[in-house]
From Swiss-Prot:
InterPro entries: Ribosomal_uL14, Ribosomal_uL14_bac-type, Ribosomal_uL14_CS, Ribosomal_uL14_sf. PROSITE patterns: RIBOSOMAL_L14. NCBIfam families: rplN_bact. GO terms for biological process: translation. Keywords: Ribonucleoprotein, Ribosomal protein, RNA-binding, rRNA-binding. This is Large ribosomal subunit protein uL14. GO terms for molecular function: large ribosomal subunit rRNA binding; structural constituent of ribosome. Belongs to the universal ribosomal protein uL14 family. Binds to 23S rRNA. Forms part of two intersubunit bridges in the 70S ribosome. GO terms for cellular component: cytosolic large ribosomal subunit. Part of the 50S ribosomal subunit. Forms a cluster with proteins L3 and L19. In the 70S ribosome, L14 and L19 interact and together make contacts with the 16S rRNA in bridges B5 and B8. Pfam families: Ribosomal_L14. The gene is rplN. It comes from Bartonella tribocorum (strain CIP 105476 / IBS 506).
Length: 122
């Protein structure tokens, strides 16, 4: 459950380390984002010589949340931290590698490129 002002880790090698959600896309009154949703983020911490720098405003896909994700079979999955992957306007990842596991729910949201780059799909 991601809302405005939420800080997230970046799960790719785009150069950003931490980002902050500044808008949840998908309707004027939408308050929360979950796994697979697209948000607008501001880069708060970045590594030197990365593709992005501190202060950049980007779009990102939420890939992990500390809030439970309930599945159709009744099982629940949750992660230790909130994480996102930076994407361009065509919803393609900016980085070339994804770090950490990603949930299967991204497949239903048409983020196949992120799933193919991820080392583990839960």
């Amino acid at each position: 459950m991601i809302q405005m002002q939420t800080n997230l880790d970046v799960a790719d090698n785009s150069g950003a380390r931490r980002v902050m959600c500044i808008k949840v896309l998908g309707g004027s009154k939408r308050k929360y984002a979950s796994v697979g949703d697209i948000i607008v983020v501001s880069v708060k911490d970045a590594i030197p010589r990365g593709r992005v720098k501190k202060g950049d405003v980007m779009k990102a896909v939420v890939v992990r949340t500390a809030k439970d994700i309930r599945r159709a079979d009744g099982s629940v999955i949750r992660f230790d931290s909130n994480a996102a992957v930076l994407v361009d306007n065509k919803k393609e990842p900016i980085g070339t590698r994804i770090f950490g596991p990603v949930p299967r729910e991204l497949r239903g949201r048409n983020h196949m490129k992120i799933i193919s780059l991820a080392p583990e799909v839960l």
